[in-house]
């Protein structure tokens, strides 16, 4: 059934949107003129012998505009350190659900 985005797609979408918003925000603050910004993320999850997962996320970002290499590197660096990316890279403690 087609019920919309999967939970994994929603997670990747959140990271992607954070990266795009960060690029737009930094460009505006620095006076860098940009056009359309797109981010495409993909992930591969591998199960370890103990049942845990190692997940690799790859990101491709396109920024339209006549940007210098320095500006492009700055914007992508900032995108790679956006809030949601930093949260996901951090250590998580996910407690078991409680019945209410």
Model-found features: residue ranges?
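Extended beta-strand/beta-hairpin segments
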Residues: 1-13, 23-100
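Alpha-helical metal-binding/catalytic segments enriched in His/Glu/Asp
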Residues: 15-19
